[in-house]
Amino acid sequence: TFGPTSKGAKIEWSKTYALDIVEKLAPEMIIKNYNITDENELKDIINRYEDDSFVVKPEGLTGGKGVKVGGIHFKGKEEGYEYAKSCLEGSGNVIIQDKIEGREFTVMALTDGENIVVTPTTFDYPYRFDEDKGPGTGGMGCLSFENGLLPFLEQSDIDECSKLIKDTLKLINKDSLEFNGVIYGGFFKTKN
């Protein structure tokens, strides 16, 4: 079978599990985040932000439409809080994460669970309108360049991402969560 077991696919549907993996493998890459299971805790965390400079990530699969970014998908802390509260009520937990500035890109790899073959790097256009405006589409389109890189990336960036994907597979399979198929790595290139 080409594709992970349902346990192996946990990295796709559990943002908490995915963040735990990043924390173990590349703590320097982790974005400050809070895994919230209680409404009082949610209020406390949201009140720590001066404005809407945070991201709300519901737990579970959302078809590419669940993550909401402050200043783009919601305006102001209160609107972000209301969305996070609805996520919390739906699944029992929600992740609040600092908003970062950078360019998002995707590195996918085909894997047999041990070896990987990296596909050309892509840049997604997940919003309906230009300039990242409008509702999320869940993956309306993407682009790549003939050299497999994007203008804002170096080969060393891809090498680092590939290593992280390979290390992620080792960790998933060490946890007895069998993974083969296509693993999707979502990354941000920031100034630092």
What spans do the regions from the language model cover?
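A short, GP-enriched loop/loop-strand-helix hinge that lies immediately N-terminal to
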Residues: T1-S14, A26-T37
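Structural element of the ATP-grasp superfamily
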Residues: A18, V22-E23
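Short gly/pro/ser/thr-enriched loop/turn and capping motifs at secondary-structure boundaries
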Residues: K7-E12, T62-G63, P126-R128
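Conserved anion/nucleotide-ligand pocket segment
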Residues: S53-I72
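General beta-strand structural signal in soluble alpha/beta enzymes
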Residues: F2-P4, I31-N35, V55-P58, I95-D98, ...
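Internal nucleotide-binding/catalytic subdomain
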Residues: V67-N192
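Short acidic active-site motifs
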Residues: E41-I45
